[in-house]
Regions:
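A solvent-exposed interaction/effector surface
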Residues: 1-212
């Protein structure tokens, strides 16, 4: 049976619906950086996802292409993730009416056996087979550290209510949010918005924190 990160690491992908502090270890990702409204039809964000998934599935199917990756085992491609910032909001807050001002890093987790050289091979393979330029897809290591996380159920636009609960929890725990250029609002998308009802969408929300 293929290794499924969502099931094997439930502490990272299936948190409770109430906020909790957790320490996240460094992980490797495929990543694409961009700016703009993620809801724009055929916009930069949607195009980035095509490149990201193209490389992710090429790596997963590498054996069938004759690529021998040391330590390879069968796995389920992990869920889409995103790091989000908004121009003019150094505290990490969001004005959901200004989605054009968003900056994002879209990511898919990589198994530890995947190297940067393997990613470069997959990028070239996608270019060769699909004539899709994936040169902006990068091997990205994110060292998240101490965070508060929660399972948000519902619309992405209703996230402020959940984030308010997280902020209250942090105050109770003697912590504050700790946003910076390297510690960023993080979301993991467990539902496909094209298939799931809006009120049932599952999104892991993580906010970097520090103790005071």
């Amino acid at each position: 049976m293929a290794f499924d990160y969502k099931k094997e690491y439930k502490e990272y992908y299936q948190p409770p619906k109430k906020p909790a502090l957790t320490e996240i270890p460094p992980m490797h990702f495929l990543a694409v950086r961009g700016k703009g409204n993620p809801n724009a039809e055929d916009g930069a964000y949607q195009q980035a996802l095509s490149r990201l998934y193209g490389v992710a599935f090429t790596l997963r199917m590498s054996r069938k292409a004759g690529k021998n990756i040391e330590g390879y085992f069968e796995y389920v491609v992990p869920p889409l993730e995103g790091l989000w910032q908004q121009n003019g909001s150094p505290d990490g807050s969001f004005d959901y009416s200004r989605k054009d001002d968003l900056s994002w890093i879209s990511m898919i987790r990589l198994p530890d056996f995947i190297t940067e050289a393997d990613v470069q091979w997959a990028i070239a393979e996608v270019q060769r087979k699909k004539q899709l330029d994936c040169s902006d897809v990068e091997f990205f290591t994110y060292d998240e550290g101490l965070c508060v996380q929660v399972m948000h159920i519902g619309s992405y636009d209703s996230e402020p209510e959940t984030i308010a609960q997280m902020t209250t929890y942090l105050t109770e725990q003697g912590c504050i949010a700790d946003h910076s250029e390297t510690r960023i609002h993080h979301e993991i998308y467990l539902s496909d918005p094209r298939k799931a009802a809006t009120e049932k969408l599952k999104t892991v929300i993580r906010i970097p924190v520090k103790r005071i």
